[in-house]
Design a protein with these regions (language model features):
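Helix-loop boundary and gating motifs at the non-cytosolic
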Residues: 1-32, 196, 200-245
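Intracellular juxtamembrane helix-capping segments at the cytosolic ends
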Residues: 6, 94-112, 227, 307-320
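Helix-to-loop junctions at the C-terminal end of transmembrane segments
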Residues: 34-47, 150, 253-267, 351
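C-terminal ends and interior cores of transmembrane alpha-helices
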Residues: 56-76, 174, 277-289
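Hydrophobic core of transmembrane alpha-helices in multi-pass small-molecule transporters
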Residues: 75-96, 214, 294-307
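Cytoplasmic helix-loop-helix junction between adjacent transmembrane helices
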Residues: 85-137
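C-terminal transmembrane helical hairpin of 12-TM major facilitator-type secondary transporters
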Residues: 269-312
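A late C-terminal transmembrane helix in Major Facilitator Superfamily
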Residues: 323-356
Length: 385
């Protein structure tokens, strides 16, 4: 909602797809850099204080973004101040989703990345499916809400609502009793066994799921930007959020179904197959010339998206070392946001220069790269086993 809200607001007040994409990219870059830092701090100091602090800082940053964007529009300029505030809004975004996954892994007995004798894999798969579905609701229905509020009321309202939700809901998650399931690393009983150096170092294999999430984010961001340009030629940029929500509906349903899929295939094969299907369906984005046709394509395209996210998060939890789940989960989330920034920027620039058709090539490339990374993950996990 923050990225799409920034894209919509800045595009609306500046009249430039490139400016909107750049501002949305600044949000993504800030989040990409800030999320792992917040995750590492949560690993070391506990989730509650970090979540409470980030909720306050993010609310202030988002409100400052609204004021700065509208002030620059009145002055007829687009200064670096807008990008700086957008960066701050992204960097302070509370990492609720990734830290919720850490809590689930702890509650299902998988906090150290290994499965105990009771084999909680199905419970964990169910939890991660639920979290990915919740992510889809926010990633996709959030932009839909942006489109509704921006078109019916004002372009600044979605960001104001985001600030209100952050300051009211994030503290509730921060103080929820489940935060005790993930003790701070500095107080963890297992710290001595790892030595005085603190939490374990991150292995290089963590880069595979992180880069995969960068591809996912690039897919999301470029699709959003391309849809904005596509909708502008038919009904106005505000309708792009509603189109994007169609993909989210099928993606959320498919993510929720992953817990019931056969487990024989394994995570790597599931990753590769879903990514290949994503790439094939993304090519269809080049075909539509009307809103109903585009909606139908997006409905199909969403089917492999949710399962890929569930699978990559599961792989990330599997390769994460003890005491670093918060860092790894936030790194995966930051990969999505960084990719969204990259995709928004690339998609916005291509849409501005060559039209939506060129911008739709970016999600195709992102899905192909995602499939290749899945092949690499298959090799690595086979050796790990």
């Amino acid at each position: 909602m923050l990225t799409m809200g920034t894209l919509t607001l800045v595009t609306s007040v500046s009249g430039s797809f490139a400016a909107g994409g750049t501002a949305a990219g600044a949000v993504g870059i800030g989040s990409a850099l800030g999320a792992p830092l917040l995750g590492s701090l949560a690993d070391r100091s506990g989730q509650r204080p970090i979540l409470l602090l980030s909720a306050v800082l993010n609310t202030l940053a988002v409100l400052a973004l609204v004021l700065t964007a509208n002030a620059t529009a009145a002055a007829g300029d687009f200064p670096l101040a807008v990008l700086a505030v957008a960066f701050a809004a992204g960097a302070t975004s509370p990492q609720v989703g990734p830290l919720a996954r850490v809590r689930w892994m702890s509650l299902t007995g998988n906090a150290d990345g290994t499965a105990p004798p009771s084999d909680p894999a199905r419970d964990l798969d169910t939890a991660l499916s639920y979290e990915s579905t919740a992510d889809e609701v926010t990633f996709v229905l959030g932009p839909a809400l942006v489109g509704i509020l921006a078109s019916l009321v004002a372009p600044w309202l979605p960001l104001a609502l985001a600030a209100a939700l952050t300051i009211t809901l994030v503290p509730g998650f921060a103080v929820h009793p489940t935060h005790r399931a993930v003790p701070a690393a500095r107080r963890s009983p297992g710290r001595k066994s790892r030595g005085a150096g603190g939490p374990a170092k991150l292995p290089w294999v963590v880069a595979l799921p992180v880069f995969a999430m960068v591809c996912m984010g690039t897919f999301f961001g470029s699709t959003q930007a391309a849809l904005s340009a596509f909708a502008a030629g038919l009904a106005g940029t505000e309708i792009a959020g509603l189109l994007y929500a169609v993909m989210g509906l099928s993606s959320a349903a498919a993510a929720l179904s992953v817990a019931y899929w056969p487990r024989r295939a394994g995570l790597p094969l599931r990753w590769v197959l879903c990514a290949v299907l994503m790439a094939a369906l993304a090519v269809l984005l080049l075909v539509p010339s009307s809103l109903p046709t585009m909606a139908a394509v997006l409905l199909l395209l969403g089917l492999p998206v949710g399962p890929v996210m569930v699978t990559v998060f599961a792989v990330g939890g599997r390769v994460a070392p003890a005491g670093r789940l918060g860092t790894v989960m936030t790194a995966l989330a930051s990969g999505i946001v960084a990719g969204t920034a990259l995709g928004s920027s690339l998609g916005g620039q291509l849409a501005q220069l060559y039209g939506p058709g060129a911008a739709f090539l970016v999600p195709v490339g992102a899905a192909v790269t995602l499939a290749l990374l899945g092949g690499g993950a298959a090799v690595v996990l086979r050796r790990k086993d």
